[in-house]
Amino acid sequence: MHRLQVVLGHLAGRSESSSALQAAPCSAGFPQASASDVVVVHGRRTPIGRAGRGGFKDTTPDELLSAVLTAVLQDVKLKPECLGDISVGNVLQPGAGAAMARIAQFLSGIPETVPLSAVNRQCSSGLQAVANIAGGIRNGSYDIGMACGVESMTLSERGNPGNISSRLLENEKARDCLIPMGITSENVAERFGISRQKQDAFALASQQKAASAQSKGCFRAEIVPVTTTVLDDKGDRKTITVSQDEGVRPSTTMEGLAKLKPAFKDGGSTTAGNSSQVSDGAAAVLLARRSKAEELGLPILGVLRSYAVVGVPPDIMGIGPAYAIPAALQKAGLTVNDIDIFEINEAFASQALYCVEKLGIPAEKVNPLGGAIALGHPLGCTGARQVVTLLNELKRRGRRAYGVVSMCIGTGMGAAAVFEYPGN
């Protein structure tokens, strides 16, 4: 109860907490490299497919996961048996996809001697996999491991919470855990005054940024083209290669967005156009202790500086990043001003806007290549995908810099991680 009162107290007065974040003194440059640093060696992702009608609609999640596992290992010429552990984030498969992920491991030529676990922390599952592998490296269990995320929203059942006690009816917070995500978006919009026009403008910007990035080839280095098969309308099977994200709509306009009806509530402001897309995809991130990476001659794409996950009220779960980001920044000894790029998952424009405004983040630092509204949101994949996108964009820019990955989490949480790009 005390925790809830603290969070609600933060929500009541945004200007004070926002200014406090901005007024904090800047960090004293970059930390010195340490042999014990947890570093990101490499990362790849599949294109993100449109669930139900895209190029991956007939592709099983183990095949998507195998594509990125294989690509990462081949890219850096790492022997599969060198992996100390694999962690795979997944939301919709039974048991967080534990069997599916182990199958993908074998399809990728990774031997049975390499262990694997599956993790489900809803929309942060891919980032939680990164944190889990980093934790194993830090505690000395192993020196190198693979963190992944995968989701086929086409082939998975959604909306079934499973076996739950009827006692939840007696507890408001327990009941709130079952509120549909679209209604939590409406709650955020209503409670904090996020207008339909602002949400649509945010969605338009996401589409425009993603379209520009796609046309310039900004995603080319991170995407693994996937050759697969699809069934056409006649039931015939044909082979295709999916090489770019399918949800990007360069023709999006404010006028078009304004015509869309509310998707979750009569008179509401959350629409299909200002919400994340239902998607299929996978991503993999190779992490190591710095000393092991150097010993094996592996590249260093980034350094994990901190990770934080926090709880917030379930009925406004989308505010999670507004509290997870400050927690992660504090652990890293940084402020909002020290960060070059914030990759904040766009579950809904309402909640993403709230978080950006709450923290006083300049718009140009937020999702510079577009976010989930344009690219899509394959639930278990997203956190790992964001890490890959963030570090590749920092690499493209070339200079030493910090970036943040963050997302809201269904049932009322937020997660965030701070990464350092070491510079070219």
Curated annotation (Swiss-Prot):
The record marks H377 as: Increases nucleophilicity of active site Cys. One of its GO terms (cellular component) is peroxisome. The active site is at C123 (acyl-thioester intermediate), C408 (proton donor/acceptor). Signal peptide: none annotated. Induction: Peroxisomal thiolase is markedly induced (at the level of transcription) by various hypolipidemic compounds in parallel with the other two enzymes of the peroxisomal beta-oxidation system. NCBIfam families: AcCoA-C-Actrans. This is 3-ketoacyl-CoA thiolase B, peroxisomal. The gene is Acaa1b.
